[in-house]
Structure formats: C-alpha cells, structure tokens
Curated annotation (Swiss-Prot):
This is Nucleoside triphosphate pyrophosphatase. The keyword Hydrolase applies. It catalyses: a ribonucleoside 5'-triphosphate + H2O = a ribonucleoside 5'-phosphate + diphosphate + H(+); a 2'-deoxyribonucleoside 5'-triphosphate + H2O = a 2'-deoxyribonucleoside 5'-phosphate + diphosphate + H(+). GO terms for molecular function: nucleoside triphosphate diphosphatase activity. Keywords: Cytoplasm, Hydrolase, Nucleotide metabolism. Belongs to the Maf family. InterPro entries: ITPase-like_fam (IPR029001), Maf-like (IPR003697). It comes from Corynebacterium glutamicum (strain ATCC 13032 / DSM 20300 / JCM 1318 / BCRC 11384 / CCUG 27702 / LMG 3730 / NBRC 12168 / NCIMB 10025 / NRRL B-2784 / 534). Nucleoside triphosphate pyrophosphatase. May have a dual role in cell division arrest and in preventing the incorporation of modified nucleotides into cellular nucleic acids.
C-alpha cells in the first residue's frame, strides 16, 4: 500500500518527501476552469474542497488498494479568490495588490481509500511584506510564482516577501500534514505506515 498524489505539484511532493513519504505521482486530468464555473457563488472553502475532490476522484479508481490524495490551494484576498497567475504580468499585478496586506491561503484536501472519502480544508493567514517594485519584478522574472496559488512560495524565493503566517506552514506550501494525518487515522492507518525508512 502506498500514497498516491493526484497532483503534479512539486511543492506537495516535497512536503510528503520531507515527511518520509515517497508518493506515487499521478496528476489528475481535471477541467478546473469548468469546475470553477460550476461552483460560482460557492464559499471559498467549498471551492477548494471540490477541486481537490475532483482530482482525487479521477485518480482513485486506478488505485483501489492505495490512499489517494488530491489537493488544491487558492488565495482569498479582498473577498476575491485567486489561483495561479500563469503570467509575469498577472504576477506583478497581484503582488502590487497583496504587498503589505493580509490574505488567507485556503488548501482543499481529498483523501480517498476504497469507498471512504474524506474532504477537508485548511486556512492559513498570510502577512505579505511591503516588497519593492524591483523585487516584485525580479520575483516574477524568476518564474517561480507563476504556477503557485497566490503567486508566491513560502519555502523558496517567495519567503523573502512573507512577514508572518498564522496557521499551518505545510498547508501554505500545498498540503497540510495535520489534515492528512487526521484523515489517515480516520481510515485506520498511522502516518508512520507510509514512511519510507
């Protein structure tokens, strides 16, 4: 038995790796834009939970004897939910909006084992630094934040521009170890059952 990560996110993989788990990577093929459109008007936590669930549900049938984890993260700032910026220009625009402000990074989790499905979200408050225009542009030029929820990373270059967080650091990076641990316990497993030691 193993953990299957229904994601191509290098950050989610690194979280599990640093916690002793070498997951099987099986990215989910989900039309996120269509799903987001269908969830229009839903609460932010529900949106990320449903995105995570859709990813896990697509992958789970291929791994009936394994634990499948789907995840999705978005940044809630000024009552607007933001995903990945994808472009340099969008990254710069977002950073000029969020610098010096507080936002909430919401990560949805879906953990599936057989017929059992656990869906939960984790929210962490982020206090963004007053980053300079030059640093914002250079950060965007690095390419690092283009495919990251909220246009930032906590564990790499983006860490320079985060003053503090309130909540679970692993959730900000993309996968809450406390949420996954609780789900494993509910499924009758120990976290250590999946350690590669």
């Amino acid at each position: 038995m193993q953990i299957v990560l229904a994601s191509q996110s290098p950050s989610r993989r690194r979280i599990l790796n640093s916690a002793g788990v070498e997951p099987l990577i099986h990215p989910a093929d989900v039309d996120e834009d269509a799903l987001l459109h269908s969830l229009n008007g839903s609460a932010p936590e529900e949106i990320v939970r449903q995105l995570a669930l859709a990813k896990a549900q697509v992958v789970a049938p291929s791994y009936p004897g394994d634990v499948v984890i789907g995840g999705d993260s978005m940044l809630l700032i000024d009552a607007t939910l933001q995903g990945k910026p994808h472009t340099r220009e969008a990254t710069i625009e977002r950073w000029k909006q969020q610098r010096g402000n507080k936002a909430t990074l919401i990560t949805g989790h879906a953990i599936i084992f057989g017929d059992e499905v656990i869906v939960e979200s984790s929210s962490t408050n982020i206090h963004f630094a007053e980053a300079s225009d030059v640093d914002i542009e250079r950060y965007a030029d690095s390419g690092e934040p283009l495919e990251c929820a909220g246009a930032f990373t906590l564990e790499a270059l983006g860490g320079w521009f985060i003053d503090s967080i309130e909540g679970d650091p692993s959730s900000v990076i993309g996968l809450s170890l406390p949420v996954v641990r609780r789900a494993l316990y509910r499924l009758g497993f120990n976290a250590s059952d999946f350690w590669n030691m």
